[in-house]
Amino acid sequence: MKNIIVLLSFFSTFLSAANWLMLQGSESKVGHHPWGFLQLRFQDNGGEVQINNGINKTPFSYIKPTLQHQSELQVARARLGLRGSLDDANKINYFLLGEVAQNGVNNSLATHTDNYLMDASITLKHLPLYIRFGRFKYAGSEEGNMARFASPFIVFSTVGDQLMLERFLDTKTPYVSNPDLYIAKPAEGTGAYRDTGIQLFQSFKLAQASYLTLSYMLGSGTGIKNEIDFHNHTHYGYVSYENILGKGKGYKQEAFKLYAWHQDGQRDLADRIRYGLGTTYFYDKLHLEAEYMKGKGMIYTGAKDTDNNINTNNWQYSLQASKKNEADGYYLLGTYELAKQFELIARYDVYNRMTNLKNEYRQFKTLTTGISYKLKDYDRVDINYAYNKASAPHNQAADQILKSFGNLLSIQYTIVLK
């Protein structure tokens, strides 16, 4: 944690820092705007496969979300939406977005957890504090807030994927040999950094080029599920300070930002707590970013094969539910524009899972490098190569399996419709 604070302090000496909360939650002008994006992706996983007594021990050697192949060409995202205003005064805004691709939203572990509606919200701007209700992205991690079509990093960091992308299990019965462990098929798609609820938010101008943004949301804790149950409510808090540095607007605004967030929610199995802080800097050709995250309770511990038939895999999610279970991690990233169309990218991330139990502790380290070739606006081709390393320092058997963890090549073509 000390090292992360030092790094954040280093970045803060600089005077993509887009304000995602305001960009996605409100409209700047009257009208109706169809939009969307398509991402075609090829991935090749260089991991080894280990099967012991018919059980596949290496889910990390396969391509998500189905874990069926080690190389795969897929439609990663296919989203179409409509946003705009419902009145001439631009006081009532709406935001709709659908997803038809067979990804983690609609086909987690090949179980067809179809839920095609990602966002459906109304924002009321009559009061000093804007009021948004419906289903939408909650304010939190920068990695989650960022529009996926704007990121040259094809997959989330390991800490973002495992700690923040919530998985919902179709069970309330613990594993036989461990009352804290739950293993089951997905009950719905991954949470996609979204929830259903009501949010109060606003960005306040402090000086000529600086802003304070605040947000509080009461969510149902159900992700993108079409059923609402406020018995499992979640509180989402967010604060950021942003200093505008130069040109650009919207997603391409040159700025420096500091932010912090906290989430505290109830679930059927246990409480789920997440919090973090970070910074972003974007000016001219250079973009820098750092974020630290920590979680307690509802710790996702990977996919498990529950079928001892050597010819088939029956993948299910596993969770260590108790609030005593903890995990933390961080990422550091940078991008640099070499020329008008070429951008070099690099990200280093670390995830420490189940830090409270030596035998269950796992550490993941990933260095992602790549290049982005811009075609037009946000249309581009991204190439990422992730060097992966995982270990179980206090569990020799698990550590041996994790040596099969391989590197991942990802190539993605993004087309933005607007």
Predicted feature locations:
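C-terminal/domain-terminus segments
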Residues: 219-238, 354-365, 370
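Cleavable N-terminal export/targeting peptides
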Residues: 1-21, 418
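Outer-membrane beta-barrel pore domains
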Residues: 21-29, 47-49, 63-67, 108, ...
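Outer membrane beta-barrel
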Residues: 22-51, 62-224, 231-236, 240-247, ...
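Residue-level detector of intrinsically disordered/flexible regions characterized by low predicted structural confidence
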Residues: 4-5, 81, 349
